[in-house]
Design a protein with these regions (language model features):
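Extracellular and analogous surface-interaction loops
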Residues: 33-36, 90-99, 152-154
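Beta-strand signatures of extracellular beta-sandwich domains
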Residues: 118-122, 173-175
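Solvent-exposed strand-loop boundary residues in beta-sheet-rich modules
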Residues: 49, 123-127, 180
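C-terminal interaction-tip segments
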Residues: 1-15, 86-112, 163-181
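Small/polar beta-strand repeat architecture
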Residues: 16-87
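Hydrophobic beta-strand signal
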Residues: 46, 84, 143-145, 161
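Intrinsically disordered, low-complexity Pro/Gly/Ser/Thr-rich segments with frequent PxxP/GP/PP motifs
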Residues: 125-159
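Short, Lys/Arg- and Gly-enriched loop/turn segments at beta-strand edges
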Residues: 51-58, 153-157, 169-174
Length: 181
């Protein structure tokens, strides 16, 4: 396959579900007392008691309980917590039997407020994902740019995914080189 440049565009990314009544135990890998409506496995947990990139792994046997992949950082139980769950938007998937290179990307804030953005690469060869950028603040009327100084190799089936802490807030433009051998 010949190498080719292409753009991958995603309009108005950002999916957020928020609960204001969460309880987080001491060094706990679960949250309780929240509505689980709209929350999905793989959503990022946005709360000061969890490290950036903490993800929902499932739902507890007790109603209103969410399990996560990391333990909380709080040393005392935290009640009445506002917890946001950031849903994923898949912005690019490397084609089958093809390697691609993420050359650059522009992530434009299309809201009237500052938003935070996280970018993740999902490795198709295993259920592993790693953040390329985490909780990057993007002010109103501005954008975040991944420049050409650091390129990211994407193997067949790898996915570039975006999370944002505001609904429909980020427009994504990725520049990709496909057909790399």
């Amino acid at each position: 396959m010949a190498e080719a440049f292409s753009n991958s565009l995603s309009r108005a990314t950002g999916i957020v579900t928020t609960s204001s009544s969460g309880t987080i135990g001491v060094y706990a890998n679960h949250l309780s007392g929240i509505s689980t409506v709209g929350i999905s496995t793989g959503d990022i947990v946005d709360n000061t008691n969890y490290l950036a990139g903490t993800k929902v792994t499932g739902f507890g046997a007790t109603a209103g309980t969410v399990t996560v992949d990391r333990v909380s950082t709080n040393s005392a139980e935290a009640t009445s917590q506002i917890v946001s769950f950031l849903g994923v938007t898949s912005c690019y998937t490397s084609p089958a039997a093809t390697k691609s290179i993420l050359i650059s990307g522009t992530f434009a804030n299309n809201t009237e407020n500052s938003v935070n953005l996280s970018i993740e690469i999902l490795d198709s060869s295993g259920p592993t994902a790693a953040l390329l950028a985490s909780k990057i603040p993007v002010p109103h009327g501005s954008s975040f740019v991944i420049s050409d100084t650091g390129k990211t190799l994407l193997e067949a089936g790898d996915v570039v995914r975006v999370y944002c802490d505001s609904d429909n807030a980020i427009d994504v433009n990725l520049s990709i080189l496909t057909g790399v051998s």
